[in-house]
Amino acid sequence: MTRKTWRNSILVLLLALTGVVLWGWRDFSRFSGAPLHVSAAGESVDIGRGSSFKEIVRQLRDQDLSTASPLYWRLLAVQMRVAGRLHAGEYATPAGITPRQLLANMAAGRVLQRNFTIVDGWTFRELLAALDKAEKLKHETAGLDHAAIMQRIGAAGEQPEGRFLPETYAYVKGDSDLDILKRAHVAMARTLDELWPGRDKDLPLATPYDALILASIVEKETGRADERAKIAGVFVRRLENHMLLQTDPTVIYGMGESYQGKIHKVDLTTDTPYNTYTRPGLPPTPIALPGKPAIMAALHPEPGTALYFVARGDGTHVFADTLAEQSRNVACYQLKKCSQ
């Protein structure tokens, strides 16, 4: 082989190697920036503690998120300087996410967060039922009675009703229902501590817990923002005048599971600790989980003279100063016997 032929052969080989390298780099670049094979929106990958990089890549391939060579994943991790720095946890793989974005999330520990919303007006039993259905949440309250649950969240001896602030709480896989309950309990206690000192003067409420009880009644009586303070005002004036509160939601709560969607006359006369038709003052505990607006209404009731109200049937209420006026309103809006 002549020297010229040798040089030509070397040149061809170098060109071939350059072509291979360029092709490989282009293919690698395409891999790092191309979306993963996500089959459904909301899919996720759960990386266990102590997983090696090789195991992570194998898991991605096993879930059909990637068919790329493990070498490409290794090169990308080295290029991003995240090799050996990937955190365990559940990571979202939404449509359009790229390998580069996924590794960046894993390196930063940006695990998938879910939200759980406690709805204003839920009872504690309804809250527990909703938690039981929450996905990716450890259910540690199973088999525990209410007293045991309160003890587990550091509130031993407290009645649970009303003690949890309706709000949206973020959680990640591995969190438990007890974690959410504890956060909601702390949030409610903090809210009462913040709002109680600024309450209106001379309210017939001795403690923040009294305010919580009244707020829970307001919460169950109306969902309208423009009526909360009005209804709170009615109840405050009735308390000041030593009148029975006579509010149906407390009766319903006291009936427990025997309530089947309708109150009968006998229910109003059957005494329970929560029957405000037979017992004076506030019931012994809240009857639901009041939201912050209802608590504000209880602490800042609207001034006025109304002592009664009745539902119109459209979500609003009509208010009355006297029993005679209330009787006419009941006949009109409840019995549909409006006088002309």
Please identify what each model-predicted range represents.
Residues 4-8, 50-55, 75-79, 88, ...:
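A broad, low-specificity signal for short, low-complexity segments enriched in glycine/proline
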Residues 2-40:
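N-terminal type II signal-anchor transmembrane helix
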Residues 4-5, 71, 323:
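Short alpha-helical segments used as structural interaction elements across diverse proteins
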Residues 52, 129, 133-141, 151-340:
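Bacterial extracytoplasmic/cell-wall-associated proteins, especially those involved in peptidoglycan
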Residues 25-193:
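Signal peptide-directed extracytoplasmic domains
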Residues 11-14, 42, 83-85, 122-125, ...:
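Short low-complexity stretches enriched in small and charged residues
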Residues 16-19, 64-65, 88-90, 140-143, ...:
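N-terminal start-of-chain detector that recognizes signal peptides
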